[in-house]
Each structure stands twice: as structure tokens, then as C-alpha cells.
Amino acid sequence: MSISYVARIINGNSEVGILDQVREPTLKIFVRTIAQIHVPLRTTTPRATQYRALSTQPNRACTQQTSSILATTPRALHTSCARDRDWQAPKPFKRRGGGRSVQNNPLASSHASEPVANDPFRHLSQNDYARPTARPQAYRSKTGDSGGREQRYKPAGGARKPRRPNPESNTQGGNWAEPKTKEPWRIQKEALAKKFPEGWKPRKKLSPDALVGIRMLHQQFPDEYTTETLAQKFEVSPEAIRRILKAKWVADPETEVERQARWHNRGKQVWTKWAALGKKPPRKWRAEGIVRDPIWNEPRGPNHKDKAARAEAQRREAQRRLASGMMG
């Protein structure tokens, strides 16, 4: 009889009780059918027995690791040896309600005893198929149980290997060594510095009128206009003045006309650029039509009227000071 059936009878529900009386025979037949079903026991293979034996007993790697850890910890943290060994022996499993243990269970004993007789690996010891041992410890501790600061872990290999010296570094001076091959621009720069210690001064081109003027000045005043003086005046080297004075070449009339025309056009180009930058050209080139922009002609400083007014104000201020000094 079900619990619901008894509860309903107690509550006085007679109609529901009649329906439960009709269902009770059917429920009994169902329970009897389930009781006749036979569930075969699960057979274990030799490999499963092997794994079960390994799971109940600690391996060698676990034992070594535990012993190394216990050796390095302080004594205050150690527990008794008997308590530490208790975990190695498998204990029977007990239920909370105080039921039967695994040792008294017939099914568990049958599972553990049946495959032993048919085990093909029974001639081998447990250590033969045990798990591989752990890798050697990378760190080791000094003698002693205390974990003080002086007894820290140190590498098993000893001191570290020294680093390989860098061949490119200069160990004597501490600076980086210069490359063996220099860049082309560096080679050219060093060559120019060696050839021109005072800096690069390109040769200045002199007009035909300047060449004639140099010869005439040196011929008329040789003591006053020497080679060094002419070099400073015309901003060329003394060697260039010496070559100009030494030259005896005189151009014919046609070549002279071409030279004058070429230098005249060159003067126009040069002063056109200067006028664009705001520089006032000489009268010769202004007559040729080379003038600067009108915006550059606006007076930016004080003009003549401002100068006259400022001078008149200064004169009056001086008279006033003189009169006040005489009166006082």
C-alpha cells in the first residue's frame, strides 16, 4: 500500500480510497515483475584491476616529492609520522548513516577476487608497471630543516654560466667599435675637410671690367695695392690675383663685345633676384627697368617731417628747462 493511500483513508476520503483499492493489485504485479529481473555483475578486465591497484597505493614519485617537501619545511609545521603514514593505507569507506562498509560488501569482494585468478599480469610485481618516476628536482636545499634566509633553494647545477662576450663591443674604452667599412658620404666629408681646412670657398667669377681694374691699380700703385690687398678687396684668393696679373692675353674686339653682352645679361638676372627680395638696385640697373615692388618703397622709418617736428620739440624742451633753471 502506498503512503498516499493511507493518508487519504485517514482523512476520510472514501471515494479516493476505493480507486486506490482497484489500483493496488496492478502495482503489486509490477513490483513482482521487477523483482524477477536479474542484473549480471560487471566483470573487470586485468587493465582495470591494474589501475585500481595503482590508485590505492602511492607511487614512488609522490613519495619522493612528499619527503622532499617535509625535509624543507620548519619543524613547527611538522606533524607526527604516524599521522602522515595514515594516508598511504586505504581505509574502508563508511556511510554517514552507519551502514555497511566496503569490506563487508559481497559485491565489492567478488569484484576484487574474481580477476586475480585470471590475471595474465599476476607474475609481475607492482613496481614493474608502476608510473614513471618524477623528473629530478631542479632545486635542492642545504643541510638542515630550518628554512632560513641563508638556506634558500639554489640551482642544482651550481653557478650560472658566464655570458659570451660581444665581439662588436669595445671592452677597453666601453664604446661601440666603429664599422670596418665607411659610408661614401663619410669618406667624401673627410676628404673635403682635409683639402679645405678653412671651409669650402668656391672660386669667384670676376667681370672683364674687374680684371682690367685689378691690372690698372697694381700697375699704377704697386706699393699700395699689393696682391694680398687686392685679394681682400675683391674677395678672392691671392693665387687668383697672381694669375690675373701674370696673364698677357687680350681679347679681340668681337670677343670683347660678346663678353660685355654676356655679363650685361648676367647682371640683369642677378639684380632681378635681389629686387624681388627687397634690395634696391643701383641706378644703372634701375635705368634698365629693374626696380623692386612698390610695396618696398613705402617708408618704414621716420620721414623728414617727423624728424623736423621731433627736433622742434626737443628745442622747446631745452628752452623750458633753461628758463626754469634761471628762475629757480
Swiss-Prot record:
It comes from the Eukaryota. It comes from Chaetomium globosum (strain ATCC 6205 / CBS 148.51 / DSM 1962 / NBRC 6347 / NRRL 1970) (Soil fungus). It is found in: Mitochondrion. Required for respiratory activity and maintenance and expression of the mitochondrial genome. Residues 101-112 have a biased composition (Polar residues). One of its GO terms (cellular component) is mitochondrion. Belongs to the RRG9 family. Its main location: mitochondrion. The gene is RRG9. Residues 81-184, 288-328 are annotated as: Disordered. This is Required for respiratory growth protein 9, mitochondrial. It holds the Pfam family Neugrin. Keywords: Mitochondrion, Transit peptide. The keyword Phosphoprotein does not apply. Residues 301-320 have a biased composition (Basic and acidic residues).
